[in-house]
Amino acid sequence: MKRLLAKSTATPDRPEGEATLLGHTALVLSAARRLLEHRGRASLLAAGLDPALEPRLRRIVLLAAALHDLGKCSEHFQSMLRRQREAPQLVRHEALSLWLCWPGQPLSAWLQRDVSELDLCLALVCVAAHHRKFQTEAFAPDGTGAGLSLELRVQHEDFARTLGRIAEELALSAPPLFTAPIVLRATRKEHPRDQLQSWQDDFERTVPAGSVDARLLAVCKALVLAADVAGSALPRSGEKQDWVDRQLTAPHPAEALRAVVERRLAGHTPRPFQEEVARSAAPLTLVRAGCGSGKTAAAYLWAARQHPGRPLWLTYPTMGTATEGFRDYLHGADVEARLQHSRAEVDFDIFGLRDGAAPGTSSRDQDRLDALRSWGADAMSCTADTVLGLVQSQRQGLYAWPGLCAACVVFDEVHAYDDRLFGCLLRFLEALPGIPALLMTASLPATRLDVLRGMCERVHGRSLAEVEGPEDLETLPRYQRLDVAEPWALVAECLRDHGKVLWVSNTVDRCMRTAEAGTSHGARALLYHSRFRYEDRVRRHGDVIEAFATEGRAAFASTTQVAEMSLDLSADLLVTDLAPIPALIQRLGRLNRRSTLERPAPVRPFVVLPFDGPPYAAPDLRDARAWMERLGTGPLSQRDLVDAWGPPGMMDAPRRQSSTWLDGRFDTWPAPCRDGSPSLTVLLEEDARAVLDGAVSAHRVTLPMNLPPESFKWRAWPRAGRLPYPIPPANALDYDGLRGARWRKP
C-alpha cells in the first residue's frame, strides 16, 4: 500500500494530492481557517455566546479539522477505497480517529502537551460527529463479516507526514513516530464499544446539557462539518480554496432587497401594515395577518431596513411554497438568489427558472456544492426543514451554517407546522438568539402563542414583538358557511356561472372518488394530490393554477391537503372535508382570496362535509366542530376565523422538542423534523430503467405512496441499482399522469 487515501480515486497508487490523507487534511484545515476568519465571531453571536470565546472556538475547530480523518489509516477503510473489501468496516473511520486521540490513547500524550484535556475532548467529539453517524453506525453489526480485529497503519510514512503537517499547522510539539501498526480488537471480552460508553459517561458529566461548553460544542460541530464539506467538494468541482473567501465576504446590499419589494409593489407605496413590520427592530417578531395582506413584501422590507448587510433566508413549509416564493419575488430580480430544496432542479426545468439564479439538488456531492453556494447568496428561498434541520443534525441544516449564522431568517406559514416542526422552531429560536427572526402566520393557537411569548421573555429579556394584519383587510367579509348535506347542486351552479370550485378532501382516495363523482355530475375535475410522480405533480399544480387564473372560464379542482399552502388561487366555492382548525383556516384562505378594500367581492360560500378518522385525531376534529358552531352561518372575515378559535387551553401546549444537535453532545445522528406517517416512495418499472440508463433523474419520477397491503410482500420488491426505491410489479399499482396512483385491491 503505497499511499494512505482519504478519498476514492481511479489511480490509488498515484493519487491526486487531494485524495490522500495528507492532502485532504491540509485542505480541510485551510477551509477551517477561512471559515473561522469570516464566521467565527458570527457563529458565537448567533448562538448567544460571548465573543471572547473566539480563541477557544478557533483552537477546538482547527484541532478537530486536523484530526478528523486520522482513522482512515485503518486497513478496512483503505481496502474499501481500493474496492478490495466487500464486508463492512469493523469500525468507522471517525470513531477510530476519536479512539486514537482520546485521553489515555496512543496520540493523546502528544496532543495534551499543548491542548487542555477538555478542549481536546470537545474537538474529538466534533471529529466523531462529522459524518453524523456516531455512535449509531460506529461499529459493524454482528454477523456481517466485518471480522474481530483491524490494523491501524500508524507506522505508514503518510501517517507520519500527516502528523508532522498537523504539528506544523497548529504549532504543536513533535509528534510520535510509530514502528508497527496498532491492532484494535472487538471481541465479547474486549470491545471498543465499551470504551466509548465509559468515555461518553465521563464526558457528559463534564459537559452538562445546556452548559456553555455544550452550546460551544454544537457550534464547533457545525463549523467542522462545513470545513470538511469545503475541503471535499471544492477540489472535485475545480474550485480553489479562495472561493470560500469570496462567498463569505460577498456584500449583501440592502438596495437589492428593496428593489425586490419595489418590483413586487409595482409603483404602489407600502401599506401601513407593511411599514410597521419593516420598523420592527426586535430580535424576534411575530406577524399575524391573513392571506393576501402583503406579509412577504413586508418581510423583504424588514430585512432591508433592519438588517442591511445580512443575507435573507425565507423558509416555507413545503417545496411547492418555496418554489412559489422564489418565482414570485426572486426570479428575474437583480439579486444573488437561490432556491434550495430536494426537488429544486426539477422545478427549475419545469417552470423555466434557469435565468437569474441556481437551484439546489440532492445528490450528496451536489448537496455539498449547493450548500457552499448558499453561503454567499443575498436571498435564499427554501423549505423550513433546510434551516430547522440544523436542530436535528440534518445534512442540509449543518451544511447551511456558515450562511445561516450571519443571516436574518423569515419563517412563513408557521401555522402549518406540525407539533414536531414547531418544537424544532422553538429550539432554534432559543438556541440561536443572535439570528434575527420574523415569524409569519395567518393564525396561531393560543397555546403556541403563549409558549412563543414565554420563550422570548426568557431568552431575550423582552416581550415578543407582535404585528397584527391591517384591520380593514382582516375584517373584510369574505366567506359564508352553507349548511347543506349535498354540495353538487352548488358546484353545478358555480360552474354554469363560469366560477371556480375548489374541493379539498382529507385522503387521496376521497379526492379521486370526488373527481369520479364530478364526472357523473357533468363536472370534469383537475386532480391535484401527493400521489404523482414528482414531475407530473408539478405539472398538475401548474394546470390548476392556470385554470383558476383564467377569467371567464369555469374550473373545478379536486385536491387534498396539499392545496392548503401550495395553491395560490382564489375560488368562488369551497367544499372541504372537516379538518383541524388550522387546516380549515388555510383552506378558507383559497376562497375569495383576491377580494380587496379597493375592489371588494361579494362573500363566497363554503361547505364543510362530515369526516372522521385518519389522518386526523378525534380531539382535533371535535374542536373543529365546536369552532364551526361558533362561526355560525353569517358573513365571515379572516379575523372572525381567528377570534372564534377559542380561549387558551383548547389545544395542548407544545412539548419541549429534543434536539440531536444541541442535546446529543457525545453522540451525533440525524433525526426527523416532522411527525411522520407510514409511507413508501417507489419507482415505476419504466422509470427505473430510465434512471439506470441515465436518461432521467430519480428525483423527477419518484412516486410517494401509502404503504401497500401486506399481502403484496412489498419488502421483497427489487430496487433500481443502489437506489432505495422499490419497484412495484405492474399488477400492484395503477398510475395515470393526470389522475395519479392508487394500489390495486389484492
Swiss-Prot record:
<comment type="similarity">
    <text>In the N-terminal section; belongs to the CRISPR-associated nuclease Cas3-HD family.</text>
</comment>
<dbReference type="InterPro" id="IPR027417">
    <property type="entry name" value="P-loop_NTPase"/>
</dbReference>
<dbReference type="InterPro" id="IPR038257">
    <property type="entry name" value="CRISPR-assoc_Cas3_HD_sf"/>
</dbReference>
<keyword id="KW-0067">ATP-binding</keyword>
<dbReference type="GO" id="GO:0003724">
    <property type="term" value="F:RNA helicase activity"/>
</dbReference>
<comment type="similarity">
    <text>In the central section; belongs to the CRISPR-associated helicase Cas3 family.</text>
</comment>
<dbReference type="InterPro" id="IPR006474">
    <property type="entry name" value="Helicase_Cas3_CRISPR-ass_core"/>
</dbReference>
<protein>
    <recommendedName>
        <fullName>Putative CRISPR-associated nuclease/helicase Cas3</fullName>
        <ecNumber>3.1.-.-</ecNumber>
        <ecNumber>3.6.4.-</ecNumber>
    </recommendedName>
</protein>
<keyword id="KW-0540">Nuclease</keyword>
<dbReference type="GO" id="GO:0051607">
    <property type="term" value="P:defense response to virus"/>
</dbReference>
<dbReference type="GO" id="GO:0005524">
    <property type="term" value="F:ATP binding"/>
</dbReference>
<feature type="domain" description="HD Cas3-type">
    <location>
        <begin position="14"/>
        <end position="230"/>
    </location>
</feature>
<dbReference type="InterPro" id="IPR054712">
    <property type="entry name" value="Cas3-like_dom"/>
</dbReference>
<keyword id="KW-0547">Nucleotide-binding</keyword>
<dbReference type="Pfam" id="PF22590">
    <property type="entry name" value="Cas3-like_C_2"/>
</dbReference>
<comment type="function">
    <text>CRISPR (clustered regularly interspaced short palindromic repeat), is an adaptive immune system that provides protection against mobile genetic elements (viruses, transposable elements and conjugative plasmids). CRISPR clusters contain sequences complementary to antecedent mobile elements and target invading nucleic acids. CRISPR clusters are transcribed and processed into CRISPR RNA (crRNA). This protein plus Cascade participate in CRISPR interference, the third stage of CRISPR immunity.</text>
</comment>
<keyword id="KW-0347">Helicase</keyword>
<feature type="binding site">
    <location>
        <position position="69"/>
    </location>
    <ligand>
        <name>Mg(2+)</name>
    </ligand>
</feature>
<dbReference type="Pfam" id="PF18019">
    <property type="entry name" value="Cas3_HD"/>
</dbReference>
<dbReference type="GO" id="GO:0004518">
    <property type="term" value="F:nuclease activity"/>
</dbReference>
<keyword id="KW-0460">Magnesium</keyword>
<dbReference type="GO" id="GO:0005829">
    <property type="term" value="C:cytosol"/>
</dbReference>
<keyword id="KW-0378">Hydrolase</keyword>
<keyword id="KW-0051">Antiviral defense</keyword>
<keyword id="KW-0479">Metal-binding</keyword>
<dbReference type="InterPro" id="IPR050079">
    <property type="entry name" value="DEAD_box_RNA_helicase"/>
</dbReference>
<dbReference type="GO" id="GO:0046872">
    <property type="term" value="F:metal ion binding"/>
</dbReference>
<feature type="short sequence motif" description="DEAH box">
    <location>
        <begin position="412"/>
        <end position="415"/>
    </location>
</feature>
<feature type="binding site">
    <location>
        <position position="131"/>
    </location>
    <ligand>
        <name>Mg(2+)</name>
    </ligand>
</feature>
<dbReference type="InterPro" id="IPR006483">
    <property type="entry name" value="CRISPR-assoc_Cas3_HD"/>
</dbReference>
